[in-house]
Amino acid sequence: LPLQLQGHNVGTEHTLVLHQEEQAWTFTGITSQPTPSLLRSLSAPVLLDYPFTEAELLTLLAHDSDAFNRWEAAQRLSLRIATNAIAATAETATEKEQNHANLLPQSVVDALRLVLEHPQLDAAFKELVLTLPSESYIAEQLDSVDPQRIHSVREAMRRQLALALQPQWQAA
């Protein structure tokens, strides 16, 4: 996607350096809302609280050329799905029902399939992207922790991925 930062030449990438708590930049000629790929190639540990939509995270997961951002998108999507499922099961589903639920939307499974099938991506990187957040990390994100529910939800997600991506796993 060519970008035209107001007052600069057209390019496909622009590095914007933050020097203040709040800053604004204007891009021209954009006809739709872009998906930001933030903190590209950054090596320092930074926590960024940006309200990515599911569609933006799916775009980053499937297409971002920055490996960390691709991994982070997968982690954010998986964590969001897990925490929502944990909250929902607390109110509605029994554990047995939860173990057989398809928690991951098909769009997430398809984006993960693209990663697994990508011929230029390293096998070790694919493994990282396809690894769900740990039970302990999921627990850290919750106000009320139910270890059995966390385990049940994560296992249901893991099982769903294993079954949905079995042909790709075997071919990899």
Label for each model-derived stretch:
Residues 28-172:
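Long, ordered, helix-rich scaffold segments
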